[in-house]
């Protein structure tokens, strides 16, 4: 009887820990500041959106988002993205670059299930409110 109760209690505790623990990949979603990497950027085939203001790219191998500010106007730029894959929770987020044009390429590494789809837009970004504005274009890629 005591062994059964101890075993049941242990199983319940393990289930509770698993239920309350968020996955590492989803915990990093939301609004993220891109890292300055300098040097060469992504494979040009990965770049789905570009204009005078910024360039946005997604490399499916390794799941890297790349963002480059192309205008020295001091205004941050962002990638607004969505991930979908049947059988898995949808995810979304914003990656912003407030380092300026002189920083060159910036990036953020994500982790997605294979065979999903990434859709993304290029946007202006307001750092104090953590909000996007004037988004345009639609890039997409498979994971």
Predicted features and spans:
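Secretory targeting and sorting signals
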Residues: 1-27
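Post-signal peptide N-terminal regions of Sec-secreted extracellular proteins
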Residues: 27-143
